[in-house]
């Protein structure tokens, strides 16, 4: 193997103008790989309001990002053609590379399969998607299952972030060479600074999606905490919380201060974790959340439901 490889990160999820935080954990993984190897990121996403495909390229020494924005379409064949054309255009810009690092097996795995068959370039898969768990199995279409099996079979390695995710993928008959590779943490950013808060502070950080993250369950727990604590603050970071206003009103908090903070830049998250007495995750299903590892790195204790890869 070459001492230094040129790795193509083929990403169905990646931060962009359309979704600035989508797949930010993949970006951090790519930057971790870039510590040892050259990395090029390829991402394609539909962007409302444009009339034709546009390409944006960001080059920074050995870490280059290539994003194509395509005109949206409800016609699946038109959408497929636009994605394929954008993919071909980006490949020309990127040039020669040694290996493909596919993030999320489907649908971008079809591109990885194409590169293996036409250019003999091997690929590995990093998988993060909770959709493989049995609770979400109904969301997988037959064509996705069929093609995913083909992609998984041809991968040199399949790297789920937890053993639990591996088991869920195997239950979906996605066989292959499995190697568990957890999510990454920037320990130069997430570190303990021994900051304390006068008021007992609890923090939760997520997408705040109710079926997944169980925000309503945490709010009910917060109400019960009023029987134990004279005062406390519970920060929910990741959304405005509008959908929980009725529940919060009905719970009628007297001692607890509930804050919903819509967006916090990743670089500022350590300050919230360091100012917290505890981090809480109440999910109904999970893989291996980055934020738990980041909390540990800051020295902040974690309370979590015992689900998935946690």
What kind of feature is each model-predicted range?
Residues 28-31, 141-158:
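Membrane-proximal helix-turn-helix segments that form the acceptor-binding/catalytic region
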Residues 164, 184:
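Carbohydrate-associated surface elements
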Residues 246-264:
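Nucleotide-activated donor-binding/catalytic signature segment of Leloir-type glycosyltransferases, i.e.
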Residues 284:
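Aromatic "clamp/platform" in nucleotide-sugar-dependent glycosyltransferases that forms part
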Residues 8, 195-213, 219-223, 235:
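Conserved donor-binding/catalytic core segment of Leloir-type glycosyltransferases
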Residues 1-56:
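N-terminal subdomain of nucleotide-sugar transferases
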Residues 152, 263-264, 271-276:
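Short alpha-helical donor nucleotide-sugar binding micro-motif in glycosyltransferases
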Residues 301-304:
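Short hydrophobic beta-strand element within catalytic cores of glycosyltransferases
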């Amino acid at each position: 193997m070459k001492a230094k490889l040129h790795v193509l990160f083929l990403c169905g999820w990646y931060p962009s103008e359309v979704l600035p935080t989508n797949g930010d954990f993949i970006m951090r993984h790519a930057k971790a790989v870039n510590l040892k190897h050259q990395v090029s990121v390829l991402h394609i996403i539909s962007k409302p309001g444009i009339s034709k495909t546009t390409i944006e390229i960001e080059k920074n020494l050995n870490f280059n990002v290539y994003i194509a924005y395509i005109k949206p379409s409800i016609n699946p064949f038109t959408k497929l053609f636009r994605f394929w054309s954008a993919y071909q255009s980006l490949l020309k810009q990127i040039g020669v590379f040694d290996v493909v690092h596919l993030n999320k097996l489907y649908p971008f795995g079809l591109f990885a399969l194409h590169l293996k068959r036409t250019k003999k370039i091997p690929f590995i898969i990093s998988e993060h998607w909770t959709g493989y768990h049995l609770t979400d199995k109904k969301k997988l279409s037959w064509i996705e299952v069929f093609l995913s099996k083909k992609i998984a079979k041809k991968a040199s390695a399949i790297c789920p972030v937890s053993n639990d995710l591996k088991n869920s993928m195997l239950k979906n008959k996605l066989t292959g060479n499995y190697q568990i590779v957890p999510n990454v943490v920037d320990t130069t950013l997430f570190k303990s600074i021994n900051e304390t808060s006068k008021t007992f502070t609890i923090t939760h950080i997520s997408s705040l999606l109710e079926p997944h993250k169980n925000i309503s369950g945490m709010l009910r727990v917060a109400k019960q905490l009023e029987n134990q604590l004279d005062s406390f603050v519970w920060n929910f970071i990741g959304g405005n919380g509008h959908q929980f206003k009725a529940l919060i009103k009905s719970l009628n908090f007297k001692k607890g201060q509930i804050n919903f903070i819509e967006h916090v830049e990743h670089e500022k998250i350590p300050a919230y974790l360091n100012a917290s007495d505890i981090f809480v995750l109440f999910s109904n299903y999970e893989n291996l959340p980055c934020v738990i590892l980041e909390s540990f790195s800051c020295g902040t204790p974690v309370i979590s439901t015992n689900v998935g890869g946690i």
